């Protein structure tokens, strides 16, 4: 699997073995594009804050 894994400029990198999901985490308090985290995961991460949005997907570079 390959996922985007940078907060700013979109850079796609291969995921470590066993990490078959891509995720994107953002916060509704910030304008779109700010405070975004992307990466690979074994399971879909849980949100840490009330206004946090987590999206998970299972195809290459799906976390744009």
Curated annotation (Swiss-Prot):
It is found in: Secreted. One of its GO terms (cellular component) is extracellular region. Disulfide bonds join 3-22, 15-40, 44-56, 57-62. Its main location: secreted. Pfam families: Toxin_cobra-type. Gene3D superfamilies: CD59. CDD domains: TFP_snake_toxin (cd00206). Keywords: Disulfide bond, Secreted, Toxin. Expressed by the venom gland. PROSITE patterns: SNAKE_TOXIN. The keyword Amino-acid biosynthesis does not apply. InterPro entries: Cytotoxin_Cobra (IPR003572), Snake_3FTx (IPR003571), Snake_toxin-like_sf (IPR045860), Snake_toxin_con_site (IPR018354), Toxin_cobra-type (IPR054131). SUPFAM superfamilies: Snake toxin-like. GO terms for molecular function: toxin activity. Is classified as a P-type cytotoxin, since a proline residue stands at position 31 (Pro-31 in standard classification). Belongs to the three-finger toxin family. Short-chain subfamily. Orphan group XIII sub-subfamily. This is Cytotoxin homolog S4C8. The lineage of its organism: Eukaryota, Metazoa, Chordata, Craniata, Vertebrata.
């Amino acid at each position: 699997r390959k996922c985007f894994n940078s907060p700013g400029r979109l850079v796609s990198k291969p995921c470590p073995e066993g990490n078959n999901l891509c995720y994107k985490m953002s916060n509704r308090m910030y304008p779109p594009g700010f405070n975004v985290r992307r990466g690979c995961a074994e399971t879909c991460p849980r949100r840490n804050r009330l206004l946090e949005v987590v999206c998970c997907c299972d195809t290459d570079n799906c976390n744009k």
